[in-house]
Structures are given as C-alpha cells and as structure tokens.
Swiss-Prot record:
This is Small ribosomal subunit biogenesis GTPase RsgA. Zn(2+) binds at residues 246, 251, 253, 259. Keywords: Cytoplasm, GTP-binding, Hydrolase, Metal-binding, Nucleotide-binding, Ribosome biogenesis, RNA-binding, rRNA-binding, Zinc. One of several proteins that assist in the late maturation steps of the functional core of the 30S ribosomal subunit. Helps release RbfA from mature subunits. May play a role in the assembly of ribosomal proteins into the subunit. Circularly permuted GTPase that catalyzes slow GTP hydrolysis, GTPase activity is stimulated by the 30S ribosomal subunit. The gene is rsgA. Its main location: cytoplasm.
C-alpha cells in the first residue's frame, strides 16, 4: 500500500493513504532504521499493517530533496519574500533561487508579500524589479493581487505538491491561511492523529488540500549554498539557459572572454543586480 509522509515526530510518522485518503500513525521497519534511511515530509512510502500497527517498509525514489526546509518530492516551490519589514534583499532572494534550483526544483515561483506597506516611490522601484525577474523567466506573484493570485496558486496545488518557503517574518503563514481558510481545523486533526498539542510551524507539515498537497515549512534565517562555482553558475536558470552561446563550455561568467551572459547584462537583458549578486556568491564560494 502507498502513502505520503505528512509529518514526522521522533520515530513516529503521520501517513496519508493515497487510496483511502485516510491519515494514521506508522513506524519504520527495523531494517530501514538499521540502514540509516532518513524519512522526511513529502516522501512516498510503501507500508503494511501488522497485528498492532502500521509499518513503513520501503521509501520510494525521490525526484528531489531539500535539506532546508527538509522536504521531498516537490512539484512547485513558492518562495515568499517580503518587500518591507523585513526589507527586500535582492541578494537574499537570488541566493534562495540558486539554492533551490540547484536541487532539481523545476518550478520555482516568487511571491512578494507586504506590498501594501510601500510608498509610491518604493512601489515604482519594486515594480521595476518585478519586471526584471519576469523578463528573466520567473513567474512572480504579489500580495496586492490577492484574489487573482489565489486562483493561480489553487490551480498549481491541484494534483501537485506545492511547498511554501521563506525567511522568518516574511508573511508565509499569512499567505497560507488566506489560501486555506480552515487551516487551523486541518492542523488540529493532524495534531489529534499524532496525540499532541496544537501544531506550530517549527517543522515541515504537509496538508492534503484541493486534490493536492501544501507543505508549510518553518521560517529560517540564512542559507549556506554548499556548492561549487560551476554548480552556482548552473543554478542561475537564466544563465544556464543562455550559456550555450558563451565561447567556453564551462564558462563561469566572471572574467572569461566572449561571455554571452555578461553581454546580456550589458544589454539589460539580464537584471544587473542579479548578476552582481551572483559575483558576490561566487567570491564567497571561492573563499
């Protein structure tokens, strides 16, 4: 029988049976534990019911795995990024994009929150930044178009696993509560299934919703890229998609001659600040 991992606490796992749509606790087979197999939220598993309990027997192969937040098998990742309180940081956003896209997340969406806190000039500047990301191929949503974007996100969730991630205080929980009005009721049901108190977002939680799944993740402070310089270059999607035109096969887009990416930056076809952020990350990896 097949299930998804909704939540993990110690050595107990909350499973969602894909055929019956029921939720129940399970433990991991001793053999898997001895093999030091790590199970995380989003994992697809096979289970059986023995005389006393449900037992996880196998972890299916993952299509992707994130360490921060710790989740697996994501179809779409929505990065919630505040434009005010805390203020927008292009470096922070570009670092998140590089980190996630290096981990086989094919569909990464940017959501700018707290747009209503900007003054007129700040809004104008932010809209120019949004246009740059859209020009570079990203889907960008924002908190001013709540109802329209709600429909877009609900359509993304259907038959998919959508994960929301972002730093602490960016408004991620506000967005998820807007999308799922009965979220508290749903999390209460999960807490009851686990025989524990009210759930708070200190660990990742997968919620069945709209014929798909939403993953709510804890906020975090910063990320370590933990990759090589070439991996960094390839994790910038707009760079990777155009690097075929560079003179050198493994061009790092720094000091190389006839670098097509630098040419695109000079022609304002790639957001210049994004390129400067790339150079900063590149130098940090070099150190």
């Amino acid at each position: 029988m097949n299930a998804k991992i909704l939540f993990k606490i110690a050595n107990s796992f909350l499973l969602y049976d894909l055929s019956t749509k029921s939720q129940f606790n399970a433990v991991i087979r001793k053999k898997l534990k001895q093999e030091d197999r790590i199970i995380t939220v989003g994992d697809n598993v096979e289970f059986v019911k023995d005389q006393y309990e449900y037992v996880i027997e196998k972890i299916d192969e993952r299509k992707n795995l994130l360490i921060r937040p710790k989740v697996a098998n994501i179809d779409t990742l929505i990065i919630v990024n505040s434009v005010k309180e805390p203020d927008f940081s292009s470096y922070g956003l570009n670092k998140f994009l590089a980190f996630y896209e290096a981990r086989n997340i094919n569909n990464v969406i940017i959501y700018f929150s707290k747009m209503d806190l900007l003054n007129k000039q700040e809004s104008k500047n932010m809209n120019q930044i949004i246009s740059q990301y859209e020009q570079n191929g990203y889907i960008v949503l924002n908190s001013l178009d709540k109802e329209k974007n709600k429909e877009k996100i609900l359509n993304m969730i259907k038959n998919n696993v959508v994960c929301f991630a972002g730093q602490s205080g960016v408004g991620k929980s506000t967005l998820i509560n807007f999308l799922i009005p009965d979220l508290e009721l749903r999390t209460q049901e999960i807490s009851q299934a686990l025989n524990r108190g009210k759930h708070t977002t200190t660990s990742s939680l997968m919620i069945p919703f709209n014929e798909g799944f939403v993953i709510d993740t804890p906020g975090f402070g910063s990320l370590d890229l933990n990759m090589t310089q070439l991996e960094l270059a390839n994790s910038f999607t707009d760079f990777r998609n155009n690097s075929v035109h560079c003179k050198f096969k493994n061009c790092l887009h720094t000091n190389e001659q006839n670098c097509f990416i630098k040419k695109m930056v000079d022609e304002n076809k790639i957001y210049k600040q994004r390129y400067l952020d790339y150079l900063k990350m590149f130098s940090e990896i070099k150190k």
